[in-house]
Amino acid sequence: MMRRRVDLPPAEPQPWAALIPPESFYARLAVYREVLVTDEDYVPLYKDSGRGRPSIPPSLVVLAMLLQYHDDCSDVEAEQRLRFDLRWKHALGLGLEDVGFDATVLCHFRRKLLDRGLERVLFERLVNAAREAGLIARTAAQVVDSSHVLGAAGVRDTYALLRGGIRKLLRVLGYTGDRQGALPERLAWYLDPTQPEKPDLDWTDPAARAQHLREIVADARAVLALVPTEDPASLSPVVAEAAGLLAKIVADDVEEGPPPAPKRRGRPRQHPVGTLPPDEPPPAADLGPRLRQGVAPDRLLSVVDPELRWGHKSSHYRWPGYKVHIAEELTSELLTTVATRPANEHDAVPAVELVCEHQAHVGLRPAELLSDGAYGTADVRAALGERGIEVVARLRPLTDPKHFSKEEFTIDLAAQDGRGSVSCPAGITTNDYRMARDTQNRPVRLYRFPRQVCAACALRQRCLGGPCGRVAHPVRQPPGRQVQLHFHEAVLQQARAAQRTPEQKRALRERLRPRAKVERKLAELMRRHGLRQGRYLGRLKTDLQAVLTGTLVNAKRLLALAARDAYTARAVRQALASG
C-alpha cells in the first residue's frame, strides 16, 4: 500500500478564502474535494512495499490535473500555480508554505494511468454519482456529436517522412555511438548531428527533386535490408514497428513502373457502339521511383506520431489530428461518453461502441439517441435498434439533380413472396435480381431492368448516364438501369418513410432541436479548456487528454447542479461518498 506524505499541512480554512467568489469552480472544488476524488481508486498505481519515499496523495495529483485542464496550462505552469496561485491553494487545501510538487509528477502520473487503464476512473465515478443522485435517468435521451482535435505532431512531406523513418530505424537497430562507424557513409549521414535536416539542393528544380527521391528511396531499402528476416518473431516490438513504419511510407508515397494515364475530368468519352477508342500515344518512359499520384488510403503524416491522419470536415476543410466523440444527457447536460478516434474514420463506425460498450460501465442505456446524419446510417440504426435504442437523425439525401436517384424508385421488399420488386419512375417493375457484395463484403440484392425496355424509355436520359457509371459502353450493349439494395434496406426504408412529407420533416426538426446543447458542450471542451489542440503524441494520450477534459467539464457541471439547493447538494455529496 502506498505511504502518504506526512509533511503536508492540514486542510484548514485560509485567510484568503473570502477573496475567492463562492460560485467559482475553485470555491466549489474546495467544498467537495474530499468526496470528489479518493486515494483508494488509485491504489493499483502503487506497489505494496515500504520502500521508497512517501508518495504524494493521488487525490491531490488528480485534483491538480483538473485545475490544470480548467486553466489550460502546461505542466510547468501548473507547478508554478501550485506555489503561487491562491485559488489553487484554496481549492486543494494547501497552506501558503506548501510548494506543491514538481511538474514531472504530472507526467509520470499520466503515464501510470495509461499503463493501468485507470484514466476513466473519475469520469465514470462522476457519472455514477449523478445517476445515483437522481440527476440522470438510466434510459434518458442522449445526444452524440464529434469535433476535431489538432495533432501535436507536425505534418511532414514525403522527403521528410523518408528521412525520419530511416533515422528512426537506424537508431532502434542500435547504429549509434560506436556502431555508427559500421554503416556505409551514405547511411551514416542520417545520424550525423552536424548535417542539416533538409539537404541543400534546388527544390525548385524537378530533376533535382527526382534525383533526391531516388537516393533516399534506395537508402530506405538499404536500411530495411539491415533488419534480420530469418526469424521475424524474434524481432523486438520497437524494431518491428520502426521497420513497418518505413516500409509503409515507401509503399504509400512512392510508386514505380510506367506512370498511370492521366485522369479525365467529367464523364467518360462516348464512342459509337461496336467501336474502340482511338489509340493514344504512351507516356514518356519514367520508371521511377516517383511521388505517388493521389493519396494512399490511411497515409502516414508523421514519424513521431504514426497514428496522425488527415480528417475532412467538408470538401474544403481538413485537419491533421484526431476526432473526439462525446455523448451528453440532455436534462443534466452531463457527458456520458468521451472517446478519441482516428480523424479519417467515419462517425458511424464507433457509434455502437460509444453508446453501448462505454456506457455499460456507468449503467446507462438511452431510449433515444439524437444525432446528425453522420451517425444515422442504416447500420447504426439496425445495431442500436436491436438493443432497444432509437436513433433520431436525418438521413442524408441522395443528391443528383440531373438523374433519378434510388429514392425515386419504389422498393417493395415483401412482393412476390419475399422476392421483392423495384418500380422505376416510368412505371416499369422488375423482380429480376442477382446477388452482389457491398463495400463491407456483405451479400445484397442488385435489381436489374431489361435492356430493351430502358433503351426505348422516354426517361432514359434522366435514368441512365448518372454518377455510378451507367453510360454506354464502347463495345458491350448499353445496360439497363440497376438498383442495389442496402444490407439493412428495411431499416433504411422505414427511416426514409418517417421523414418524407413536410409535416414529418417539421416533427423531426422539433425532436432534434435539443441537439444544439451538445454544440455548446463541444465549444466548452475545445475553446475554453484547450481540447482543440492536442497536447500529447499518439491516440491513446490524446484520448487521455479528452477524457480528463471531459471529467473536468462534468465536475464543473455536477458541482453547479449541487449548488442549486440543499437537497441536491446533499444527494450529490452522499452519492460521491458512497461511490
Q: What function would you assign to each model-found segment?
A:
Residues 47-51, 506-509:
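A ubiquitous short alpha-helical element
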Residues 54-57:
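Short helix-capping and inter-helix turn/linker motifs at the boundaries of alpha-helical repeat units
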Residues 37, 69-72, 86, 90:
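Short alpha-helix boundary/capping elements
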Residues 60-72:
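Alpha-helical support elements that line or immediately flank enzyme active sites
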Residues 87-105:
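Short, positively charged loop/turn segments that connect secondary-structure elements
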Residues 1-50:
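Basic, low-complexity segments
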Residues 60, 81-84:
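Non-catalytic DNA-binding core/recognition domains of DNA-processing enzymes
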Residues 74-82, 96-99, 107-579:
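Anion-binding and metal-coordination hotspots
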